[in-house]
């Protein structure tokens, strides 16, 4: 295994802030729903300046770390917020076969849902609408990096915990 990359430029290279007709934008919409659920202290932890950016397959290199990752720790969220993060995970895995999605969920849970960290990037906001186009979800054995600027590119890397 290793990381996978997917993307879509629905209406051309430079999409509008609403990403009309983009096949994967629903994933960012769901992540932004989590953002809307956060309170002041949580927002401060989750909203960062600039993302890691694209670095080929190293964009989603796994660190194996449970602490010191970018963003807010899912373990510090309320139960309803955690539930919504799991909906984000479900959306990330929706394009894949059911058996592959279930195996991926098993690996993510083995690394600890509470050890996932969710971050959004204000310096890469298309349209200055505070609907965050660039965000990531990272844990010890999973990284999802979503870049919706100028169109959607997304990376996903999940491995069995070591």
Model feature map: region roles:
Residues 1-162:
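A cross-kingdom marker for long, charged
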């Amino acid at each position: 295994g290793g990381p996978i990359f997917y993307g879509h430029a629905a209406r051309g290279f430079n999409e509008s802030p609403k990403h009309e007709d983009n096949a994967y934008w629903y994933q960012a919409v769901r992540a932004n729903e989590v953002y809307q659920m956060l309170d002041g202290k949580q927002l401060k932890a989750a909203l960062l300046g600039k993302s890691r950016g694209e670095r080929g397959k190293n964009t989603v290199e796994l660190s194996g770390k449970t602490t010191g990752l970018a963003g807010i720790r899912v373990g510090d969220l309320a139960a309803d917020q955690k539930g919504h993060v799991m909906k984000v995970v479900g959306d990330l895995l929706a394009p894949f076969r059911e058996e592959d999605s279930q195996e991926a969920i098993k690996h993510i849970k083995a690394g600890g849902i509470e050890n996932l960290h969710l971050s959004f990037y204000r310096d890469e906001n298309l349209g200055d609408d505070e609907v965050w186009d660039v965000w990531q979800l990272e844990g010890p054995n999973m990284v999802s990096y979503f870049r919706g600027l100028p169109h959607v590119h997304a990376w996903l890397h999940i491995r069995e915990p070591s």
